[in-house]
Amino acid sequence: MAFSMLVSLVGTQMQNVAIDWHVWILTRSPLALGLVGLVRVVPIVIFSIVGGLVADRRDRRRVLIVTQSAMTLVALTLGVVTLLGRDTIGLVYLLTACTSAAGAFDNPSRQSLVPRLVPEKDLPGALAILLSGFQVASIGGPALTGLILAGTAGAAPAGASLHGHTGGLALIYFLNAVSFLGVLVTLFTLQTSGEITRAEGAPENPLASLKEGLRFVFTTPILVWTMTLDFFATFFAGSMSLLPIFADQVLKAGPAGYGWLRAAPGIGALIGSVWTSVHSLPRRQGRVFLWAVAVYGAATITFGLSRGFWLTFGALALVGLSDTISTVVRQTVRQLVTPDALRGRMTGVNMIFFMGGPQLGELEAGFVASLFASAALGASVAVVSGGVGTLLVAAFIATRAKVVREYDWSAARPSAWPQEKK
C-alpha cells in the first residue's frame, strides 16, 4: 500500500503545484493566487468534521475507495477542459474546491486507519515513514511539474491567448488521474477491515456523535493548544501560493525554477522525517515542537528577504525540515491521546486547523501582496510579515501553555472516553 500511496501523492503534489502556476498564467494577479487558498479551505471547513464522523461510523477502507475515485474524476475533468482550452479561472477554482471537498472525507479515514495497521509502540516511526513518503512526493511532484511546464510552453504572456500554452498542465492533470489507480486496486484488495468497534456508552445518533467528538477535542488541553499553534503559525507563514511570483518576477527562474523551489520544502522535510524515523526525539517533545515552529518562522523571513535562488531554496528547505519535525510531534500526540473510536472525528477537527491555517494564510498573503503596485515587492512584504507573526505566536504559546512546554509522550495514554453515559 505504501508504494501505491507514494505514486498517488506524487500525482497530487504535481496537480497542486500546477494549479498555482495555472492561476498565475491565467490572471497575473497575487490576489487570484491567494484566492486559491480560500477555494481550498472552504470545503475543508464545511466537510472535514462530517468527514471525521463518517470515518468513525463507516468502514474507512470503503470511504477511501469513494474519495479516491472522486479525486480521479476531478483530475480527469481538469485535464480535459485544459486541453480543450476551456480552462476559465472560475472552472479551475470550482474543480479545485471539489478536490478539497473529497479530501475532507479522505484524510480522516486515511489517518485513522494507520493506528490499526501498526502496534502502538511503532506508531511514531510509522507516522515518520508516512511523512517521508509524503515528502518524497513533495520533492518529485513539484520537480516533475517544473520540468513538464518548462519542456512544453512555460508561462504565457499576460493578456495573450493561452491556447497551446497549457498542454503541459493538461498532461500533469492526466498523470494525477492515473496515479490514483494503484491506491484503488490496493484498497479493493486490502485484508485489514476499516470498521471500528464502538465504545461502550458511545452515542448512536450522528449529531450526538459529532458533539461527543467536539467535546473530546476541546476539553483536551494538549489538543487545543497544539491545534491553535498549528493554525496561527501556518496562517501567518502560509505563502507557497506566491512562489510563482518569486520564480517569475523576483528570481527570474521560470517554470523549471518554480518547480524546484516548490520541491525545496519537500527536500528539507524528507531529511527531517528520515531523521525522526531512526532517532528518538528527546524528552519533553513539547519544547521540540515550539522550537521547530520558531525555526519555521525564521526560515520564512529569510525566504521573503532573499534575492538569490539558492538562498531562497535553502530557506524553503529549512521551512520544510522544521515543519516536519513539528508535524511528527503533533500527529503522534494526537494519535496517542485519542481513543480509536474518536480518531476520525479528532482528525476532522484537526483538518480545519491543519489545512485551514495555511490555506487562509495563502489568501492573507495574496491580499497583502495585492496592496502593492509591484507584485514582487508585495509578495516579499507578505512573506516577511508572516514569518514575524509566526515567531510572535510561538513565543506567546511558549509562555502561556505549560501543558505544551512540558509535554512528554512517554507518559501519554488514550483518554478513557466516554466518561459519561448518554
Regions found by a protein language model. Give the residues of each.
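Alpha-helical transmembrane-bundle signature of multi-pass membrane transport and export proteins
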Residues: M1-K422
